[in-house]
Amino acid sequence: MGALLLLAIVWPDANVAAQTAAPPPAFVYSDGYRTRAKIHKIGSLAMVPLLTTQGLIGRSIFNEPTPGKREWHGRVAWGIGGLFAANTVTGAWNLIEGRKNPNGRKRRLAHGLLMMAADAGFLATALQRPDVTRPDYGGQRSRHRTLAFTSIGLATAGYAVMLFGNR
């Protein structure tokens, strides 16, 4: 009888063990994740001056269009497009790799969705480039500008989610 009592004390009940579950292990990111995150952050920092420059050139074209301004507007647009492509690849890849990490998941997902919406908006902006030879040039300009500023707004919101939400 004493042996059973000793066994009961030494051998914990299965229910007690189930009630005190160990915390989940820390999430470990790969070296590739960290490299992509670094590229992504550098690209994000470069985006702010590019978008500002593009907005200023675009406003100048809207007020007083010249061929030189249009050329520079196109060059900066290609730069923004390339940078967005790189950040979309690195960001989406890291979003997929980090999908099982519960810490900051909603913030990362909100950022990713906002930036993908901005991607689509910038593509639509490029496809809606005004053509001076068309009779509806004024309407095209307005649509292009609206798409551009909406896309910039989405990108800014996505940027802010990570900048201010990353404790």
Task: Report the location of each language-model feature.
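N-terminal targeting leaders of membrane proteins
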Residues: 1-75, 83-105, 163-167
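Short, charged, amphipathic alpha-helical segments
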Residues: 68-79, 108, 138-150
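Amphipathic alpha-helical coiled-coil segments
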Residues: 81-92, 123-126, 155-161
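Short, solvent-exposed interaction modules
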Residues: 93-141
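Generic hydrophobic-segment detector
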Residues: 30, 34, 81, 101, ...
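Terminal recognition/anchoring or ligand-binding modules at protein termini
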Residues: 139-167
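Hydrophobic alpha-helical transmembrane segments of polytopic
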Residues: 43-50, 76-83, 111-121, 147-154
